[in-house]
Amino acid sequence: MALILMIYWAFAKSKWFFYILVAILFGGNLHFRTLSIRFSDPKPEYEVTSWNIMSYNVRLFDVYNSSTEARNKSRDSIVNYIQNVDPDVVCFQEFFHQDRPSSFSTRDTLIELMGYKYYHERYSHRIRNRQNFGICMLSKYPIIAKGDVMFENFKTTDNYCIFADIVKGQDTIRFYDIHLQSIKLQQQDYELFGEKNKQAGSKSSTFRLLIDKLRIAYPARAEQAERVVEHMKTSPYPVVICGDFNDTPMSYVYNQFNTSLVDSYRETSTGIGVTYVGRVPAGRIDYIFHSGDLGAYDFGIQKVAFSDHRAVHCKIYKKQL
């Protein structure tokens, strides 16, 4: 929210830009969470069974692109990227799946190409009894239990959390795939920062609308995060949480997970780690967290984006006692 306010007041040439800038600069350790500094990747020195994990908001594989050629190119690029990384478990947000027969295959293509024999999914919208919109987890290894963490009004907000207990060799890990509430910016909101909206009165009106959306989104995300954390405490296995938090490392939502889990990016990487490449800069909002008895290495962020989010991936292993 502070970043959005800064952008607005910078465009408006308001003195409040300098006030909020000072507040950010003096935010202390809270703001240093956005930056990670590691001098080496903490790859284990002993032989381990590692899990290759990916989290990816695919923005419905660009299914609403009016150009069939562009739509297919986006989907194929996403599928090719996943093939190259070759994750054991991939957690999708904003997932689209069309029942067979399909002219725009997604889930079934991934299953056929990469051998994802096991999956768990949750859809809130189903159009013409064939097109499904929601969240999906694909696994190469057996899922022995699965379920959902239900959010308030999930059918109208399109936000979900699913979990699955997955077995690889002698290890069992509970994976959570989450998509938390977004601000739901519309075209008129984006125009607040562009040249199309030049009149002061119009800017003020749009800005008030934006603040109202923030007031709805922040408490909703907080409540959703709290539900996931409470459910996580009941897990009989180590946990990995993947997802689009729609919030930065400075947020209350991030802190809910960071208090008891390890942020894989900060454990392994150096830099800010930008994952959102949409029209309003948001920095790192896609995460892979894990329990303290697990370790992570070889973290990667997708370099060429085929969605408004970059995929994140890393290898997870169980630490020796």
List each model region and its residues.
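Transmembrane alpha-helices and immediately adjacent membrane-cytoplasm interface residues
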Residues: 2-42
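Active-site beta-strand/loop signature of hydrolases that rely on acidic residues for catalysis
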Residues: 52-58, 77-103, 164, 175-179, ...
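Beta-strand-turn-beta hairpins that frame and shape the catalytic cleft
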Residues: 45-54, 131, 135, 140-145, ...
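Short, solvent-exposed loop/turn segments at secondary-structure junctions
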Residues: 58-61, 97, 126, 141-143, ...
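Membrane-embedded segments
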Residues: 34-164
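Acidic/histidine-rich helix-loop elements
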Residues: 55-73, 96-99, 184-217
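Metal-dependent phosphoester-hydrolase catalytic domains
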Residues: 1-8, 18-19, 219-240, 245-321
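Short, solvent-exposed aromatic-acidic interface loops
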Residues: 150-155, 180-182, 303-305
